[in-house]
């Protein structure tokens, strides 16, 4: 069995075993490094992730590989650190020699789609690994994740503009500090954060930049405390200009959060820029220390929505253009790309999976039909299964419908223009999700369960006698379930 096929089969079984959310959190960045006789080597971007997988999932992964190939006896997990070198005291990201700027956005009336795709090819081909300071600190940057390769659209345009402003600002913070970007998995948060870091380190003002995942921050601080080296680490972090933290929802532990709170306060009070990303809004990060949550809410929170059809098609076109760099003979008809863009709607990550499936299948099924593509991608299209509804989705859609913000929905404001949408959102959260009254109350600014119960009963009573409101609620249900 080919190595790539083996890894693909094991990955699919692993995702089915642990569930899509756990898989996206811990295994999305797992890659096949090599297969040598009876040993399979996998790679991950951080030491923390390696330790986490070894301690919790190594036996499961070993069993899945052995189920596919009984000759496999051992699984090793490595850390991808090949592009990191140097011995500087401050473990900061160091700028590579700047390449010629390549501007690339979605096609406009003055820029044909073919030209935009060609620019995507140029941007990826020109990308080179970023250099790093010490190998002891900082999560690795992917040189492919730049502003040039980021697909802009209506769902991310505001966040992209804010990110570019920060990358170009130089020393000192911009007005919106911290910048908090949130969305469900697979919509491009990590790409955008790494684009900020990659651009900032090339800034002629020689910015001192640190990009970290929350899991790496936890591991690095725990290691420093264990080795009695915490003061050195703190001093290093105090001297940076830009701190970028990804996957904030994973920041755990009272001591670690206490240290992060001190760092956050120090940087913000010193007018240093902070950029944070998570899978939910800052006020929904219930596991965070309230002081950290409060500080994160003091800046600007921007949400990514799922990409629209035009964005999805552009992502597929660019992915095809890059794949042709490796295999110039690769051809995928435009109608197949358009069909995939119309039907795989959840996230860019699932779109990437659909594209990889197409490329893989065309190697031995060159005449793929649309019907065959539907069979292959049924697990991504949905297979008629009901969509899992989240409270944050309900809040977002209700807020948009009534022209208020999500933050207003969870605030203490009691004006009529806010109270009615809030009660409707609580009602829909109870009827469309399995969440309890207390949990819904926590998601709406820490309200008591009796407040949620009152809202549900109130909306039920109003619906029974108000046809217009009943139609509004049904419309919202359809929008939420789309």
From Swiss-Prot:
Plays an essential role in the initiation and regulation of chromosomal replication. ATP-DnaA binds to the origin of replication (oriC) to initiate formation of the DNA replication initiation complex once per cell cycle. Binds the DnaA box (a 9 base pair repeat at the origin) and separates the double-stranded (ds)DNA. Forms a right-handed helical filament on oriC DNA; dsDNA binds to the exterior of the filament while single-stranded (ss)DNA is stabiized in the filament's interior. ATP binds at residues 186, 188-190. Residues 140-362 are annotated as: Domain III, AAA+ region. Residues 71-139 are annotated as: Domain II. Residues 363-482 are annotated as: Domain IV, binds dsDNA. InterPro entries: AAA+_ATPase (IPR003593), Chromosome_initiator_DnaA (IPR001957), Chromosome_initiator_DnaA-like (IPR020591), Chromosome_initiator_DnaA_CS (IPR018312), DnaA_C (IPR013159), DnaA_dom (IPR013317), DnaA_N_dom (IPR024633), DnaA_N_sf (IPR038454). Its main location: cytoplasm. Signal peptide: none annotated. Domain I is involved in oligomerization and binding regulators, domain II is flexibile and of varying length in different bacteria, domain III forms the AAA+ region, while domain IV binds dsDNA. It is found in: Cytoplasm. Transmembrane segments: none annotated. Coiled coil: none annotated. This is Chromosomal replication initiator protein DnaA. It comes from Rhizobium johnstonii (strain DSM 114642 / LMG 32736 / 3841). Residues 1-71 are annotated as: Domain I, interacts with DnaA modulators. Belongs to the DnaA family. GO terms for biological process: DNA replication initiation; regulation of DNA replication. PROSITE patterns: DNAA. GO terms for cellular component: cytoplasm; plasma membrane. It comes from the Bacteria. The gene is dnaA. Keywords: ATP-binding, Cytoplasm, DNA replication, DNA-binding, Lipid-binding, Nucleotide-binding. It holds the Pfam family Bac_DnaA. GO terms for molecular function: ATP binding; ATP hydrolysis activity; DNA replication origin binding; lipid binding.
């Amino acid at each position: 069995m080919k190595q790539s096929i083996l890894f693909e089969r094991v990955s699919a079984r692993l995702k089915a075993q642990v569930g899509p959310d756990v898989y996206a959190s811990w295994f999305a960045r797992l890659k096949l490094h090599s297969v040598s006789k009876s040993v399979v080597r996998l790679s991950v971007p951080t030491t923390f992730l390696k330790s986490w997988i070894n301690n919790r999932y190594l036996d499961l992964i070993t069993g899945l590989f052995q189920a596919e190939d009984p000759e496999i006896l051992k699984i090793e997990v490595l850390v991808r650190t090949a592009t990191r070198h140097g011995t500087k005291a401050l473990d900061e990201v160091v700028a590579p020699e700047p390449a010629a700027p390549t501007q690339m956005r979605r096609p406009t009336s003055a820029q044909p789609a073919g030209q935009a795709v060609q620019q995507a090819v140029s941007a990826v081909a020109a990308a080179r690994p970023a250099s790093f300071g010490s190998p002891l600190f900082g999560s690795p940057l992917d040189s492919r994740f730049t502003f040039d390769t980021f697909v802009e659209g209506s769902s991310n345009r505001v966040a992209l503009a804010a990110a570019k402003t920060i990358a170009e600002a130089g020393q000192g913070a911009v007005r919106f500090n911290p910048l908090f970007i949130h969305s469900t998995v697979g919509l491009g948060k990590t790409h955008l954060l790494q684009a900020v870091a990659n651009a900032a380190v090339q800034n002629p003002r020689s910015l001192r930049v640190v990009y970290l995942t929350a899991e790496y921050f936890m591991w690095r601080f725990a290691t420093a405390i264990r080795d009695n080296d915490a003061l050195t680490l703190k001093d290093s972090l105090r001297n940076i200009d830009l701190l970028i933290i990804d996957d904030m929802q994973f920041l755990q532990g009272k001591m670690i959060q206490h240290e992060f709170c001190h760092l956050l306060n120090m940087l913000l009070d010193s007018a240093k820029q902070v950029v944070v990303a998570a899978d939910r809004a800052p006020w929904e990060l219930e596991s965070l220390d309230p002081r950290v949550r409060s500080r994160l809410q003091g800046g600007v929170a921007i949400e990514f929505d799922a990409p629209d059809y035009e964005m999805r098609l552009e992502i597929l076109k660019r992915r095809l253009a890059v794949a042709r760099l490796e295999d110039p003979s690769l051809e995928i008809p435009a109608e197949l790309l358009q069909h995939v863009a119309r039907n795989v709607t959840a996230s860019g990550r699932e779109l990437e999976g659909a594209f990889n499936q197409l490329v893989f299948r065309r190697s031995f099924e060159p005449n793929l039909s649309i019907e065959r593509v539907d069979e292959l991608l049924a697990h991504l299209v949905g297979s008629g299964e009901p969509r899992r509804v989240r409270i944050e989705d309900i809040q977002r859609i209700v807020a948009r419908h009534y022209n208020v913000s999500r933050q207003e929905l969870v605030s203490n404001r009691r004006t009529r223009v806010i109270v009615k949408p809030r009660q409707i959102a609580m009602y829909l959260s109870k009827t469309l999700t399995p969440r309890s009254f207390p949990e819904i109350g926590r998601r709406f600014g820490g309200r008591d369960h009796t407040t949620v119960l009152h809202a549900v009963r109130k909306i039920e009573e109003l619906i029974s006698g108000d046809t217009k409101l009943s139609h509004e609620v049904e419309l919202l249900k359809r929008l939420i379930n789309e």
